[in-house]
């Protein structure tokens, strides 16, 4: 069984600057980490490999520093890794990102199963996985919280649809996005880290390596949406001080709670 897991390096801090001209996050040199939801995707792949055998390839898109998350996936148990990195890919929205990942997947060959985390912590759109499946022309199932059955032909999955649980059977090849409730992710193996050579091979693909080399379909040029600005939510916190003895303070507090209708 050939499994592909899409992973992403996301900012590890909220102190991230934004390019004033493009509205894009400036990621170079920023403290980063593996997207938490992708840990659940990796663990799902490892469990399926243990059950059905096969190989696991991890795929990421970003600057060269994104090789760090691919290395982390090696230490956890991935067999191969590939990074899509080109300045022409920069500033991509969900559509351009999905298209780039789909093109990269085609260059890597055929996969039985593609796994994505439900969403990323820097975008929270939960759209890349489904859009990637559409570009590849394969069925997809989202919000997976449990694999009820897995065999050589397909998967039986339970999905969390917020107000209900849904069960579906999907044949290979397919793409699934997994939620945080599916498994507890394993930690990177120190022994495996020692066993892996200092410079394990990570395949690097650029725009010229894609089957479709039309740069207008990638990055900012291929993005139908663009971010105007990113800003923290406004906080309207009012502070009021009262002075007096216990009876005065109790009366003041009672008045506020009554006014705010906290007491019914």
From Swiss-Prot:
Top-level enzyme category: oxidoreductase
Activity regulation field: Activity is stimulated by divalent cations. Highest stimulation is observed with Ca(2+).
pH-activity profile: Optimum pH is 7.0.
Cofactor(s) demanded: FAD; AMP
Comment on bound cofactor: Binds 1 FAD per subunit.
GO cellular component: cytoplasm
Subcellular location field: Cytoplasm
UniProt keyword NAD present: yes
UniProtKB keywords: Cytoplasm, FAD, Flavoprotein, NAD, Oxidoreductase
EC number: 1.1.1.436
InterPro entries: ETF_a/b_N, ETF_b, ETF_beta_N, Rossmann-like_a/b/a_fold
Domain of life: Bacteria
Reaction(s) the record says it catalyses: lactate + 2 reduced [2Fe-2S]-[ferredoxin] + 2 NAD(+) = 2 oxidized [2Fe-2S]-[ferredoxin] + pyruvate + 2 NADH
Tagged with keyword Transit peptide: no
Biophysicochemical property: temperature dependence: Optimum temperature is between 20 and 30 degrees Celsius.
Primary location group: cytoplasm
Molecular function GO terms recorded: electron transfer activity; oxidoreductase activity
Alphabetized Pfam families for the sequence: ETF
Subunit-structure text: Part of the stable heterotrimeric lactate dehydrogenase-Etf complex, which is formed by the lactate dehydrogenase LctD and the electron-transferring flavoprotein (Etf) alpha (LctC) and beta (LctB) subunits.
Family statement: Belongs to the ETF beta-subunit/FixA family.
Purpose: The lactate dehydrogenase-Etf complex catalyzes the oxidation of lactate to pyruvate. It uses flavin-based electron confurcation to drive endergonic lactate oxidation with NAD(+) as oxidant at the expense of simultaneous exergonic electron flow from reduced ferredoxin to NAD(+). The electron transfer flavoprotein (Etf) mediates the electron transfer between the different donors and acceptors.
Designated name of the protein: Lactate dehydrogenase (NAD(+),ferredoxin) subunit LctB
Annotated organism of origin: Acetobacterium woodii (strain ATCC 29683 / DSM 1030 / JCM 2381 / KCTC 1655 / WB1)
Gene: lctB
């Amino acid at each position: 069984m050939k499994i592909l897991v899409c992973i992403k390096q996301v900012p590890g801090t909220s102190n991230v600057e934004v390019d004033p001209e493009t509205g894009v996050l400036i990621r170079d040199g920023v403290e980063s980490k593996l997207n938490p939801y992708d840990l659940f995707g990796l663990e799902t792949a490892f469990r399926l490999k243990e059950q059905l055998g096969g190989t696991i390839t991890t795929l990421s898109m970003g600057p060269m520093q994104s090789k760090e998350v691919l290395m982390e996936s090696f230490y956890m148990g991935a067999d191969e890794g590939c990074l899509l990195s080109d300045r022409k890919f920069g500033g991509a929205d969900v559509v351009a990102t999905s298209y780039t990942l789909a093109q990269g997947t085609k260059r890597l060959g055929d996969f039985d199963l593609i796994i994505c985390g439900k969403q990323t912590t820097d975008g929270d759109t939960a759209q890349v996985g489904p859009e990637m499946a559409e570009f590849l022309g394969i069925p997809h199932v989202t919000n997976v919280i449990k694999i009820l059955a897995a065999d050589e032909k397909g998967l039986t999955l339970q999905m969390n649809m917020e107000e209900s649980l849904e069960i579906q059977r999907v044949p290979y090849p397919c793409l699934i996005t997994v939620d945080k409730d599916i498994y507890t992710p394993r930690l990177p193996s120190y022994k495996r880290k020692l066993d892996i050579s200092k410079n394990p091979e990570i395949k690097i693909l650029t725009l010229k390596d894609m089957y479709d080399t039309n740069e207008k379909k990638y990055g900012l040029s291929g993005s139908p949406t663009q971010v105007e600005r990113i800003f923290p939510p406004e906080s309207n916190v009012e502070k009021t001080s009262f002075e007096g003895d216990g009876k005065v303070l109790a009366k003041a507090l009672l008045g506020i709670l009554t006014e705010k209708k906290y007491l019914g």
